[in-house]
A protein has these predicted regions:
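His/Asp/Glu-rich metal-coordinating catalytic cores
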Residues: 2-73, 78-187
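Single conserved hydrophobic/aromatic residue that forms the stacking wall/gate
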Residues: 185-195
Length: 195
């Protein structure tokens, strides 16, 4: 008997700075529908990796399941969250969703690598929702050091998760919007928080 399950798989960025790439999946084991949050790079330690310019997350697990990847969501435009998108998109082939500032950066990166820019979709903040397989994803403004940074409210049949992305607690940020915690205290509040 097969049961549906919710999975979370960090491919980079967990326990390290840079190379953010996370997978959420829902469904029966081995046939879950998948979404990706961020596709970033990291920069090498010049003492230990001379001649290496960028390090990408290992997405071989995702490539093997490419037909199950429903969407890629980018939380903000820092290189460690969007820097690998144009380098890896062709291997995954899923539509990309981001807020306006981040989407424009992502489109530019796609053009530079001769990838189709029209796969990058601009979305508005919550309550707008993007449906991707069994997931409904909303972008929630959060303070950070770059415009239009977002946490993601990810709803699945198993519950709701907040994927925070990078953030700083700042009620009056110089760049971007302040986080409104009231957004998480609605009837659609999250069951889990992943930072």
């Amino acid at each position: 008997m097969s049961e549906n399950r919710l999975i979370y798989l960090p491919l980079g960025g967990a326990g390290e700075i840079g190379m953010n790439a996370y997978v959420y999946g829902y469904g029966r084991a081995e046939i879950e529908r998948l979404i990706v949050v961020d596709l970033g790079v990291t920069f090498p330690d010049m003492d230990g990796s001379p001649g290496v310019d960028l390090i990408l997350p290992d997405v071989s697990w995702l490539i093997e399941r490419r037909d199950r990847v429903d969407a890629i969501f980018i939380t903000h435009a820092h290189e460690d969250h969007v820097g690998a998108l144009a380098l890896l998109w062709e291997k995954l082939g899923a539509p990309v969703y981001a807020r306006s500032f981040t989407a424009n950066i992502a489109r530019r990166k796609m053009l530079e690598k001769e990838q189709p820019e029209n796969v990058v979709n601009t979305v508005s903040i919550w309550p707008e929702t993007v449906s991707a397989g069994p997931f409904d994803v909303s972008f929630v403004p959060i303070s950070h050091s770059i415009p239009e940074s977002s946490a993601l409210l990810i709803a699945s049949p198993a519950g709701r998760i907040v994927h925070s992305g990078d953030f700083k607690l700042d009620k009056t940020p110089i760049v971007g919007e302040a986080f409104d915690p009231c957004l998480l205290y609605t009837s659609d509040a999250a069951d889990d928080l992943l930072c």
